[in-house]
Regions:
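Flexible, low-complexity linker/loop segments at domain and module junctions
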Residues: 187-188, 220, 269-309
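Acyl-CoA/ACP chain-elongation machinery
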Residues: 79-102, 106-122, 155-169, 197-204, ...
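Active-site-proximal alpha-helical scaffold in enzymes
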Residues: 36-39, 44-47, 53-87, 125-146, ...
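Stable alpha-helical structural segments in soluble proteins, enriched in small hydrophobic residues
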Residues: 66, 177-185, 210, 214, ...
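Condensing-enzyme catalytic core mediating Claisen C-C bond formation in acyl metabolism
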Residues: 110-192, 306-309
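Active-site nucleophile and cofactor-binding loops and adjacent substrate-binding regions
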Residues: 27-37, 54-62, 226-236, 261-263, ...
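Active-site-proximal gating segment of KS-fold condensing enzymes and close homologs
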Residues: 4-54, 96, 101-103, 203-217
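Glycine/charged-rich beta-loop-alpha catalytic/anionic-binding loops adjacent to active sites
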Residues: 19-29, 46-56, 111-119, 159, ...
């Protein structure tokens, strides 16, 4: 989402206190550290991987967008297998200041600060982390006896063309995305939704309204939870953490809760699995994500049916 922030922040702070700074041999990795595809190159060199190298910079949807790109490459027959991932280490003053000035960070310093869908929510809690998945064509995976955790049914992404950060409270943009995503399906039945659930006033209402518009009364029967309630918002990798959480719900038949949901918001009145996990068979799951720049992405994941099922 924001590149090599630690290196850039260090150099920026150095420039502030030293007008005559000289870039010397010690700065040989400064350029590499700021490039978005440096991680790709280092991983491929370490693992001996060749082929397509792509770095997506789509903000907080980037991890899921990488999954979508890999999925489309495999569907088109261009790849049999690929590794996709997202990584973010934004915990530096430079990032805090940038996000704070637009008012999206929580001002709450307690352990309950990340509280998606709660009346008490007032911004997200920034975090860091890396998430990676191996995507593979089904027969290719079966031929090498790989463990298959789940199947990608479909992916789609849109831009709302509205605002860099603001979201319309009616949820229509996410609703339009879901209409496109589900167009190929004969039904809209979903067992679980892993929401973007960022703990901001705008986003959580935006998603809630979108779900209501698309699923109608059935939405009250679908459990929804936010991974960010427990691990914060890790920007680009957050959407992929959401996908992994949904995959593990499919594998384990357990849905993690939205913690810190102790004060209900009457406008956010769906089943957000408050505070305690639940046991439920999950045959398919929807994961949604939104990012600065007006990007909205979503993916449907499903349980793999073995031969004879």
């Amino acid at each position: 989402a924001i590149g090599g922030t630690q290196t850039v922040a260090d150099k920026f702070e150095e420039l502030l206190v030293n007008d005559n700074i000289i870039f010397n041999n010690n700065d040989s990795h400064f350029y590499d550290s700021g490039m978005y595809h440096t991680l790709n190159v280092l991983l491929k060199r370490k693992l001996g991987i060749k082929g397509i190298t792509t770095a997506l910079s789509t903000g907080c949807t980037a991890g899921m967008d990488c999954l979508g790109l890999g999925f489309e490459e495999i569907i088109d027959g261009d790849l049999d297998i690929c590794m996709i991932g997202a990584s973010e280490a934004p915990l530096v003053n430079f990032t805090y200041a940038t996000l704070d000035v637009i008012g999206c960070l929580s001002k709450n310093t307690s352990d309950y600060a990340s509280c998606p869908f709660s009346l008490d929510r007032n911004g997200f809690v920034i975090s860091e982390g890396s998430a990676f998945l191996v995507l593979e064509e089904y027969n290719h995976a079966k031929d090498r006896n790989a463990r298959i955790y789940a199947e990608v049914e479909d992916f789609h992404s849109i831009n709302n063309g509205n605002h860099m950060t603001n979201l319309k409270s009616d949820g229509l943009d996410m609703y339009e995305l879901l209409n496109i995503l589900f167009k190929k399906r004969k039904e809209t039945t979903i067992d679980y939704i892993n929401a973007h659930g960022s703990s901001t006033k705008q986003n959580d209402l935006f998603e809630t309204e979108a779900y209501k518009k698309f699923f109608g009364k059935d939405i009250y029967k679908i459990p929804i939870s936010s991974t960010k309630s427990m691990i914060g918002h890790s920007l680009s990798s957050a959407s992929l953490f959401g996908c992994i959480s949904a995959i593990m719900s499919i594998v384990t038949s357990k849905i993690h809760p939205t913690i810190n949901l102790n004060n209900n918001d009457e406008k956010c009145d769906l089943n957000y699995v408050p505070n305690y996990s639940i046991n439920k068979t999950v045959n398919n799951a929807l994961v949604t994500a939104s990012g600065f720049g007006g990007i909205h992405s979503a993916v449907i994941l499903k349980k793999v049916k073995e031969e004879g099922e």
